[in-house]
Each structure stands twice: as C-alpha cells, then as structure tokens.
From Swiss-Prot:
GO CC, alphabetical: cis-Golgi network; Golgi apparatus; Golgi membrane
Subcellular location: Golgi apparatus membrane
Its job: Involved in transport from the ER to the Golgi apparatus as well as in intra-Golgi transport. It belongs to a super-family of proteins called t-SNAREs or soluble NSF (N-ethylmaleimide-sensitive factor) attachment protein receptor. May play a protective role against hydrogen peroxide induced cytotoxicity under glutathione depleted conditions in neuronal cells by regulating the intracellular ROS levels via inhibition of p38 MAPK (MAPK11, MAPK12, MAPK13 and MAPK14). Participates in docking and fusion stage of ER to cis-Golgi transport.
Organism: Mus musculus (Mouse)
Name recorded for this polypeptide: Golgi SNAP receptor complex member 1
Gene, per the UniProt record: Gosr1
Residues found modified as Phosphoserine: S141
Residue spans of biased composition, Basic and acidic residues class: 41-51
Topological relation to the membrane, as annotated: Single-pass type IV membrane protein
Entry-linked InterPro entries: Golgi_SNAP_su1
Subunit structure, interactors included: Component of several multiprotein Golgi SNARE complexes. Identified in a SNARE complex with BET1, STX5 and YKT6, in a SNARE complex with BET1L, STX5 and YKT6, in a SNARE complex with STX5, GOSR2, SEC22B and BET1, and in complex with STX5 and COG3. Interacts with GABARAPL2.
Modified residues (N-acetylalanine): A2
Single Gene Ontology BP annotation: protein transport
Conditions for induction: Decreased levels in 25-hydroxycholesterol treated melanocytes (at protein level).
Annotated Pfam families: V-SNARE_C (PF12352)
Length: 250
C-alpha cells in the first residue's frame, strides 16, 4: 500500500515538472512574440497593419492569431498544473506519517510557488501585449487620418509639417522606450532562470541534508572547526602583534 501511494506521489511530481517545463518554454516564446510585435509595428509605421478600419483579434495579422493561440495553450497548461497541485494537496492531507507530511508539504509549496510565478508572468506579458497593440492601433489611426487629410486637401501648410515632425519624434521616442523595455524583459528572463536554478540547488541540498543526517552533522562539525581554527589563528596573530609592538617600543 505504501509503495503504491509513493508511486502515485512520484507520478504527480513527474507530471508537475513536465508541465512546468512546458510552461517555461511557452512563456519565453510568448514574451518574444510580444517583443517582436512591438518591433514589427515600429518598422511598419502603421501603414500595412491598419489597411482596414477594424483589426479584430482573430482576423488580424498572423501575430495576433499566434498570440491568441499561445494564450489559450498557456491557459490550458496553467489549468492542468493547477489540477496536479490540487491532487498533490489532497495526497498530503491523506498521508498519515507526520514526518513524511512535512516533507511533502515542502515539495507542494515549491510547486505552488512556481505555478504562482508562471501565472503572474503570463498575465503581465498578456497585458503588455494588449497595451502595445492598442497603442499601435491608435498610432495607425492617427497616421491614417493624416494621410487622408493630406490627400483630401492637397495642402502641405506649415502646421501639417510641424504636426508630422512631432508625430515622427514621438514614434522615435516610443521606439527607444520599447527597446529599453525589451532589454529589461530579457534581463528579467535571465534573472528568473538563475533564480530557478538557485532554488533547485537549495532544494536539493535540503533534501540531501534531510535524507542523510550524518552528512548534515558532519558539515556542521566542519564549520564549527573552521570557526574555532579561525579564532585560534586570530588570537595567535593578535598576541604576536602585541609582542612585536612591545619589543619595538621597548
């Protein structure tokens, strides 16, 4: 019976790790899609993306369709991972050994933290993508109105020229801001990856220490002996220094 329940727990952990790996890859691609969408809008200048009056989500550009598809896939993966975490929680409550329960709860909390981080990252990237698309819609509409005004009136007065120059200046500033945001997002991805690696190393060290108390005790004794040797060495150096000073000023 114990072997069966242990296998069930390991199967749940395996499913959770597999879903977490899939979500990590999906979120990286999702973030890159958001960045490429922004750069594409800057290069196009709003001319090709807004050839019609409306740009619905599913009938717009290929990037819009890809965004919708990836968002649905990530939401499904998050839902599946949530279900696996719920099953793991039920298992921890049904387990009868207190010491085993503590270890299981620690593992469950770690998977819950990962799920929370992935959910937060998904919603943040999705909101950024929506904001960029709305801004591109607005800029494209302004560009279209300007072109319509120029073609309709046929007059290039100084006010229109100044407005166009100001518009181009704003677009250049917006592009610089987007590039800065892209660099920041890439840096955040690297920091998130490093944090995950550190968490994994810390968890493995804790697991090793819990499984092998003798190793943990040996490490503690080594650390105590190092501190003791450092104190002795410091005392010897201090005494020698005092003796040298007394000898020098004698």
């Amino acid at each position: 019976m114990a072997a069966g329940t242990s296998n069930y727990w390991e199967d749940l952990r395996k499913q959770a790790r597999q879903l977490e790996n899939e979500l990590d890859l999906k979120l990286v691609s999702f973030s890159k899609l958001c960045t490429s969408y922004s750069h594409s809008g800057s290069r196009d200048g709003g001319r090709d993306r807004y050839s019609s009056d409306t740009t619905p989500l599913l009938n717009g550009s290929s990037q819009d369709r890809m965004f919708e598809t990836m968002a649905i896939e990530i939401e499904q993966l998050l839902a599946r991972l949530t279900g696996v975490n719920d099953k793991m929680a039920e298992y921890t409550h049904s387990a009868g050994v207190p010491s085993l329960n503590a270890a299981l709860m620690h593992t469950l909390q770690r998977h819950r933290d990962i799920l929370q981080d992935y959910t937060h990252e998904f919603h943040k990237t999705k909101a950024n993508f929506t904001a960029i698309r709305e801004r591109e819609n607005l800029m494209g509409s302004v560009r279209k109105d300007i072109e319509s005004y120029k073609s309709g009136s046929g007059v290039n007065n100084r006010r229109t020229e100044l407005f166009l120059k100001e518009h181009d200046h704003l677009r250049n500033s917006d592009r610089l801001i987007e590039e800065t945001i892209s660099i920041a997002m890439a840096t955040k991805e690297n920091m998130t990856s490093q944090r995950g690696m550190l968490k994994s190393i810390h968890s493995k060290m804790n697991t090793l220490a819990n499984r092998f108390p003798a190793v943990n005790s040996l490490i503690q004794r080594i650390n105590l002996r190092k501190r003791r040797d450092s104190l002795i060495l410091g005392g010897v150096i201090g005494i020698c220094t005092i003796l040298l000073l007394l000898y020098a000023f004698h």
